[in-house]
Swiss-Prot record:
CC terms in the record's Gene Ontology section: microtubule cytoskeleton; plasma membrane
Gene from which the chain derives: RELL1
Family that this chain belongs to: Belongs to the RELT family.
Keywords, ordered alphabetically: Cell membrane, Coiled coil, Glycoprotein, Membrane, Phosphoprotein, Signal, Transmembrane, Transmembrane helix
Cytoplasmic face residues: 79-271
Record's compositionally biased regions (Pro residues): 155-165
Organism: Homo sapiens (Human)
PTM summary: Phosphorylated in vitro by OXSR1.
InterPro entries for the chain: RELL1, TNF_rcpt_RELT
UniProt protein name: RELT-like protein 1
GO aspect biological process, one term: positive regulation of p38MAPK cascade
Comp. bias (Basic and acidic residues): 233-244
Stretches in topological domain Extracellular: 24-57
Functional description taken from the UniProt entry: Induces activation of MAPK14/p38 cascade, when overexpressed. Induces apoptosis, when overexpressed.
Coiled-coil regions listed in the entry: 89-113
Amino acid sequence: MAPRALPGSAVLAAAVFVGGAVSSPLVAPDNGSSRTLHSRTETTPSPSNDTGNGHPEYIAYALVPVFFIMGLFGVLICHLLKKKGYRCTTEAEQDIEEEKVEKIELNDSVNENSDTVGQIVHYIMKNEANADVLKAMVADNSLYDPESPVTPSTPGSPPVSPGPLSPGGTPGKHVCGHHLHTVGGVVERDVCHRCRHKRWHFIKPTNKSRESRPRRQGEVTVLSVGRFRVTKVEHKSNQKERRSLMSVSGAETVNGEVPATPVKRERSGTE
């Protein structure tokens, strides 16, 4: 018997079924594996990406302006406090400012206490030509006139030396005003070589301890943080006005009159 030929539709259906059965197990595992790999790449973070994203230099760029702004803000605060009468200092700057204040106060006291003759001599001696002529005149008088008075400050005069010492005595202390030293011996010529040739070094005042430094009158510490201090000092003009008022009131009480108050003075003026 000859085999029967299958119809075309049956052959086409069989081919589609076989092709689907063969292709489905091959494609499905590929899709599943790609999905699992894709999910793994999404869920597991890689350490290389984290280290690459961090930029520590950007932190420095952000901190520098912050510190700069803080410094400007501190300077502004100190400027405002100084306008209101406060004083912002540190321990390093305090020594220099105290020396300047002491010099200013010393000059003020000298100017207030000096008399008219002293001021005239001071202004005359400011001129170098006058000072040289005066020194030459004093030197000539001391050389040609043995009876002329010679002071230790006179140019050309021998320095003062202590008197003769007893056998069991101790050497005297020779003080020149510029330096301190000890001179011993019974001969008057036994003097300091530096005094004779005017070679000396000025004595610098010893640095006092911080605790023994007296505070200036009217100084009040408002804030103290480490080396930074904020103090408030009264103006010297107010102190001088108070002193003048006290002196005027004292003079009036000495004369036997009671000082009148400002209210009484106004009433007397209106009357």
